[in-house]
Protein backbone atom coordinates (compact mmCIF):
# COMPACT_ATOMS: atom_id res chain seq x y z
CA UNK A 1 0.00 0.00 0.00
CA UNK A 2 1.33 3.43 -0.85
CA UNK A 3 0.50 6.96 -1.79
CA UNK A 4 2.41 9.68 -3.57
CA UNK A 5 2.29 13.36 -2.61
CA UNK A 6 3.89 16.23 -4.51
CA UNK A 7 4.98 19.12 -2.27
CA UNK A 8 5.44 22.58 -3.76
CA UNK A 9 5.83 21.09 -7.24
CA UNK A 10 9.41 19.94 -6.67
CA UNK A 11 9.56 17.31 -3.91
CA UNK A 12 7.98 13.88 -4.17
CA UNK A 13 6.94 11.88 -1.10
CA UNK A 14 5.94 8.22 -1.12
CA UNK A 15 4.80 6.03 1.76
CA UNK A 16 5.18 2.29 1.33
CA UNK A 17 4.21 -0.53 3.67
CA UNK A 18 6.83 -3.22 3.11
CA UNK A 19 4.61 -5.79 4.84
CA UNK A 20 7.21 -7.59 6.96
CA UNK A 21 10.57 -6.90 5.36
CA UNK A 22 12.67 -9.25 7.49
CA UNK A 23 16.05 -10.73 6.71
CA UNK A 24 16.53 -14.49 7.06
CA UNK A 25 18.66 -14.43 10.23
CA UNK A 26 17.42 -14.70 13.79
CA UNK A 27 17.82 -11.69 16.08
CA UNK A 28 18.20 -13.05 19.61
CA UNK A 29 16.52 -9.94 21.05
CA UNK A 30 13.41 -10.13 18.86
CA UNK A 31 10.54 -12.49 18.15
CA UNK A 32 11.28 -12.96 14.45
CA UNK A 33 10.88 -16.76 14.33
CA UNK A 34 8.19 -16.55 11.64
CA UNK A 35 10.70 -15.14 9.19
CA UNK A 36 13.41 -17.77 9.14
CA UNK A 37 14.16 -20.40 6.47
CA UNK A 38 13.09 -23.27 8.76
CA UNK A 39 9.86 -21.62 9.91
CA UNK A 40 6.40 -22.59 8.70
CA UNK A 41 6.49 -19.44 6.56
CA UNK A 42 9.72 -20.71 4.94
CA UNK A 43 11.31 -17.29 4.67
CA UNK A 44 14.24 -18.31 2.49
CA UNK A 45 16.96 -16.10 0.95
CA UNK A 46 15.25 -16.54 -2.42
CA UNK A 47 11.96 -15.13 -1.09
CA UNK A 48 13.80 -12.33 0.68
CA UNK A 49 15.68 -11.18 -2.42
CA UNK A 50 12.57 -11.49 -4.56
CA UNK A 51 10.76 -9.20 -2.12
CA UNK A 52 13.59 -6.66 -2.29
CA UNK A 53 13.48 -6.77 -6.09
CA UNK A 54 9.73 -6.13 -6.11
CA UNK A 55 9.98 -3.28 -3.59
CA UNK A 56 12.79 -1.57 -5.48
CA UNK A 57 10.88 -1.78 -8.77
CA UNK A 58 7.80 -0.33 -7.08
CA UNK A 59 9.78 2.62 -5.70
CA UNK A 60 11.32 3.37 -9.09
CA UNK A 61 7.90 3.14 -10.76
CA UNK A 62 6.51 5.71 -8.30
CA UNK A 63 8.89 8.33 -9.62
CA UNK A 64 8.05 10.93 -12.22
CA UNK A 65 9.23 12.14 -15.61
CA UNK A 66 10.87 15.56 -15.66
CA UNK A 67 9.89 16.85 -19.07
CA UNK A 68 12.07 19.92 -18.62
CA UNK A 69 15.17 17.75 -19.10
CA UNK A 70 14.07 15.93 -22.24
CA UNK A 71 16.04 17.19 -25.22
CA UNK A 72 18.62 19.08 -23.16
CA UNK A 73 22.32 18.31 -23.51
CA UNK A 74 23.44 15.03 -21.98
CA UNK A 75 26.19 15.51 -19.34
CA UNK A 76 28.01 12.48 -20.82
CA UNK A 77 27.78 13.74 -24.40
CA UNK A 78 26.88 17.44 -24.82
CA UNK A 79 26.12 16.94 -28.50
CA UNK A 80 23.46 14.34 -27.75
CA UNK A 81 20.04 15.24 -26.25
CA UNK A 82 19.45 13.79 -22.80
CA UNK A 83 16.92 10.98 -22.42
CA UNK A 84 17.42 10.61 -18.67
CA UNK A 85 14.29 12.35 -17.47
CA UNK A 86 13.00 9.81 -14.92
CA UNK A 87 13.26 10.83 -11.25
CA UNK A 88 12.74 8.46 -8.36
CA UNK A 89 10.83 9.88 -5.36
CA UNK A 90 12.79 12.34 -3.23
CA UNK A 91 11.47 10.72 -0.03
CA UNK A 92 10.22 7.20 0.65
CA UNK A 93 8.71 6.49 4.07
CA UNK A 94 8.89 2.75 4.78
CA UNK A 95 6.81 0.81 7.29
CA UNK A 96 7.53 -2.70 8.61
CA UNK A 97 11.29 -2.99 8.10
CA UNK A 98 13.36 -5.10 10.46
CA UNK A 99 16.81 -3.53 10.66
CA UNK A 100 19.68 -1.68 9.03
CA UNK A 101 20.70 -4.82 7.14
CA UNK A 102 17.52 -4.97 5.07
CA UNK A 103 17.76 -1.24 4.29
CA UNK A 104 21.35 -1.66 3.14
CA UNK A 105 20.31 -4.51 0.85
CA UNK A 106 17.37 -2.48 -0.48
CA UNK A 107 19.36 0.67 -1.22
CA UNK A 108 22.73 -0.83 -2.19
CA UNK A 109 22.03 -4.33 -3.56
CA UNK A 110 18.73 -4.04 -5.44
CA UNK A 111 17.49 -2.06 -8.43
CA UNK A 112 17.95 1.05 -6.24
CA UNK A 113 21.71 0.62 -5.98
CA UNK A 114 22.42 3.32 -8.57
CA UNK A 115 19.87 5.78 -7.19
CA UNK A 116 21.98 7.04 -4.26
CA UNK A 117 19.37 6.92 -1.49
CA UNK A 118 20.51 7.56 2.07
CA UNK A 119 18.32 6.50 4.97
CA UNK A 120 17.53 6.85 8.65
CA UNK A 121 15.42 4.52 10.76
CA UNK A 122 14.11 3.83 14.25
CA UNK A 123 15.20 1.13 16.70
CA UNK A 124 11.90 0.45 18.43
CA UNK A 125 11.12 -1.81 21.40
CA UNK A 126 8.50 -3.61 19.29
CA UNK A 127 8.71 -7.31 20.17
CA UNK A 128 8.91 -8.46 16.56
CA UNK A 129 11.55 -5.92 15.64
CA UNK A 130 9.33 -3.90 13.32
CA UNK A 131 10.54 -0.37 12.56
CA UNK A 132 9.97 2.56 10.22
CA UNK A 133 12.52 4.25 7.99
CA UNK A 134 12.97 7.17 5.64
CA UNK A 135 14.85 6.96 2.36
CA UNK A 136 15.87 10.34 0.99
CA UNK A 137 17.81 11.84 -1.90
CA UNK A 138 20.81 13.77 -0.49
CA UNK A 139 20.56 16.16 -3.46
CA UNK A 140 17.04 17.11 -2.32
CA UNK A 141 17.40 16.88 1.46
CA UNK A 142 20.55 17.64 3.45
CA UNK A 143 19.95 15.83 6.74
CA UNK A 144 20.37 17.97 9.85
CA UNK A 145 19.19 15.52 12.49
CA UNK A 146 17.06 12.44 13.08
CA UNK A 147 15.75 10.74 16.19
CA UNK A 148 13.18 8.27 17.44
CA UNK A 149 10.17 9.38 19.45
CA UNK A 150 9.40 6.62 21.94
CA UNK A 151 5.70 5.93 22.46
CA UNK A 152 4.78 5.86 26.12
CA UNK A 153 2.86 2.58 26.59
CA UNK A 154 -0.57 2.52 28.14
CA UNK A 155 -1.03 0.39 31.29
CA UNK A 156 -0.77 -3.36 30.60
CA UNK A 157 0.18 -2.91 26.96
CA UNK A 158 3.13 -4.08 24.90
CA UNK A 159 5.70 -1.67 23.48
CA UNK A 160 4.91 -0.38 20.00
CA UNK A 161 6.82 1.20 17.14
CA UNK A 162 8.60 4.53 17.59
CA UNK A 163 7.85 7.59 15.48
CA UNK A 164 10.78 8.66 13.29
CA UNK A 165 11.60 12.36 13.11
CA UNK A 166 14.06 13.86 10.63
CA UNK A 167 14.86 17.43 9.66
CA UNK A 168 16.95 18.71 6.80
CA UNK A 169 17.62 21.53 4.40
CA UNK A 170 15.75 21.44 1.09
CA UNK A 171 16.54 23.10 -2.22
CA UNK A 172 15.27 26.59 -1.38
CA UNK A 173 17.32 26.58 1.86
CA UNK A 174 14.22 26.06 4.01
CA UNK A 175 14.25 23.45 6.77
CA UNK A 176 11.81 20.59 6.25
CA UNK A 177 10.57 18.48 9.19
CA UNK A 178 9.45 14.92 8.41
CA UNK A 179 7.66 12.42 10.63
CA UNK A 180 7.23 8.75 9.76
CA UNK A 181 4.89 6.59 11.80
CA UNK A 182 3.13 3.27 11.58
CA UNK A 183 0.17 3.40 13.94
CA UNK A 184 -0.87 0.28 15.90
CA UNK A 185 -3.07 -2.00 13.83
CA UNK A 186 -6.82 -2.29 14.26
CA UNK A 187 -6.47 -5.96 15.12
CA UNK A 188 -9.07 -6.81 17.72
CA UNK A 189 -11.47 -4.17 16.48
CA UNK A 190 -11.81 -0.40 16.47
CA UNK A 191 -12.79 -0.12 20.14
CA UNK A 192 -9.81 -2.16 21.31
CA UNK A 193 -7.22 -0.44 19.13
CA UNK A 194 -8.51 3.13 19.42
CA UNK A 195 -6.74 4.03 22.73
CA UNK A 196 -3.37 2.89 21.35
CA UNK A 197 -3.79 4.80 18.11
CA UNK A 198 -4.87 7.93 20.00
CA UNK A 199 -1.77 7.66 22.19
CA UNK A 200 0.46 7.66 19.10
CA UNK A 201 -1.50 10.55 17.56
CA UNK A 202 -1.20 12.53 20.79
CA UNK A 203 2.59 12.20 20.89
CA UNK A 204 2.85 13.11 17.22
CA UNK A 205 0.72 16.22 17.81
CA UNK A 206 2.91 17.18 20.77
CA UNK A 207 6.07 16.88 18.65
CA UNK A 208 4.54 18.97 15.87
CA UNK A 209 3.37 21.62 18.35
CA UNK A 210 6.87 21.91 19.79
CA UNK A 211 8.24 22.72 16.32
CA UNK A 212 5.54 25.32 15.63
CA UNK A 213 6.21 26.88 19.04
CA UNK A 214 9.70 27.74 17.81
CA UNK A 215 8.67 28.64 14.26
CA UNK A 216 5.02 29.12 13.39
CA UNK A 217 5.77 28.91 9.67
CA UNK A 218 7.81 25.71 9.87
CA UNK A 219 7.49 23.26 6.98
CA UNK A 220 6.27 19.91 8.31
What are these language model-derived features?
Residues 11, 87-90, 117, 176, ...:
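Residue-level recognition of the N-termini of beta-strands and the immediately preceding loop/turn
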Residues 6-112, 120-124, 130, 201-202:
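N-terminal, active-site-proximal structural segment of metallo-dependent hydrolase catalytic domains
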Residues 164-220:
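Extracytoplasmic, non-cytosolic globular domains
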Residues 96-177, 183:
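Structured beta-strand-rich core segments of catalytic domains in phosphoester-bond hydrolases
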Residues 22-23, 152-154, 185-188:
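A short local loop/turn or secondary-structure capping micro-motif enriched for an aromatic residue
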Residues 42-50, 123-126, 149-154, 208-213:
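Short C-terminal domain-edge/linker segments immediately following a structured domain
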Residues 1-4:
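Classical Sec-dependent N-terminal signal peptides that target proteins to the secretory pathway
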Amino acid sequence: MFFTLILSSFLTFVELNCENLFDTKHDSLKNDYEFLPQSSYKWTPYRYWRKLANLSKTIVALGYEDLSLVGTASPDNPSRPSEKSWHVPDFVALCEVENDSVLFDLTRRSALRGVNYDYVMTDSPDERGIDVALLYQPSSFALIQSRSIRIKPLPDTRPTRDILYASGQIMNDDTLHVFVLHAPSRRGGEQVSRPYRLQVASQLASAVDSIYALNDSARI
